[in-house]
């Protein structure tokens, strides 16, 4: 399985293409559909895929992803069952899987045990939205040793010195949160994102991915034009997958992913 860094390097060497990173919640509507969705996204233009592990107190998630997590947990989804899906599907994918999970489940299982397990099943990246920079060392070093790239988040309110510190520590890429607040679909992208991207370019040459609020191909293109190396789309994908039957949802996310990819390429 290719690493997140290698994926970005390949894209940069190929006419500086912008990466598409869709997000889905594992277990919504069920784990069988999650497995199929990973394959659909992989062949529909995704360069990497974020897979959200459902959690009972998802502080960073907006209403669409919160509802998906609740449905998934109510069906009995656990971290272990999610990792079984990753283990089954990851060998079939060209896109590396980035797990999105909160810190408490990691702490509960033990940092090294968790990291080794997710690496062994095929995940290559990790995003922990409630892990502050000041506590990131507990994950960064063991993750690096094991082969998991821990991506840190930059908030739109972050001062320049903090951006610099996060950029220095983040692995794989840097996740720029486009709006204050939780995930979710927005009608317009804030022009503040353009300024933040410019600020970040002054302190790092690492890839930057923009997420939270992108719901339309036109917004994805705008973010690319502002200089982002990746576009991360979550709620709009989760919403489409949840609507109608599982087969209808899979068809919808495949078409949406293709439209997003066409816009940014």
Curated annotation (Swiss-Prot):
Keywords tagged on the record: Amino-acid biosynthesis, Aromatic amino acid biosynthesis, Lyase, Tryptophan biosynthesis
EC number(s) stated in the UniProt entry for this protein: 4.2.1.20
Active site annotation, chain numbering: 50, 61
KW Metal-binding (keyword) present: no
Entry's Gene Ontology cellular component terms: cytosol
Entry's Gene Ontology molecular function annotations: tryptophan synthase activity
Enzymatic reactions: (1S,2R)-1-C-(indol-3-yl)glycerol 3-phosphate + L-serine = D-glyceraldehyde 3-phosphate + L-tryptophan + H2O
Pfam family, one: Trp_syntA
Superkingdom classification of source: Bacteria
Record flagged with keyword Acetylation: no
Pathway membership: Amino-acid biosynthesis; L-tryptophan biosynthesis; L-tryptophan from chorismate: step 5/5
Subunit comment: Tetramer of two alpha and two beta chains.
Sequence similarity: Belongs to the TrpA family.
Protein name as catalogued: Tryptophan synthase alpha chain
């Amino acid at each position: 399985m290719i690493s997140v860094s290698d994926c970005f390097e390949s894209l940069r060497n190929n006419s500086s293409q912008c990466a598409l990173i869709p997000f889905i919640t594992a277990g919504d509507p069920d784990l069988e559909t999650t497995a199929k969705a990973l394959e659909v996204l992989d062949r529909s233009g995704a360069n990497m895929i974020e897979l959200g592990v459902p959690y009972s107190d998802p502080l960073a998630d907006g209403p669409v992803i919160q509802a998906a997590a609740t449905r998934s947990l109510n069906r009995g989804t656990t971290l272990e069952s999610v990792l079984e899906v990753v283990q089954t599907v990851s060998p079939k994918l060209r896109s590396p899987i980035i797990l999105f999970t909160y810190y408490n489940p990691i702490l509960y299982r033990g940092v090294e045990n968790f990291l080794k397990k997710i690496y062994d099943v095929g995940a290559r990246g990790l995003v922990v939205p409630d892990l502050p920079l000041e506590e990131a060392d507990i994950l960064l070093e063991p993750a690096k040793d094991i082969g998991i790239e821990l991506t840190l988040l930059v908030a739109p309110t972050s001062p320049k010195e903090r951006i610099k510190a996060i950029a220095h520590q983040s692995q794989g890429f840097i996740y720029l949160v486009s709006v204050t607040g939780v995930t979710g679909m927005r009608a317009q992208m804030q022009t503040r994102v353009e300024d933040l991207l410019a600020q970040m370019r002054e302190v790092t040459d690492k890839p930057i991915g923009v997420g939270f609020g992108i719901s339309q191909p036109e917004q994805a293109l705008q973010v690319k034009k502002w200089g982002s190396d990746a576009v991360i789309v979550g709620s709009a994908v989760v919403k489409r997958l949840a609507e109608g039957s599982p087969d209808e949802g899979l068809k919808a996310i495949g078409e949406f992913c293709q439209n997003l990819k066409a816009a940014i390429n």
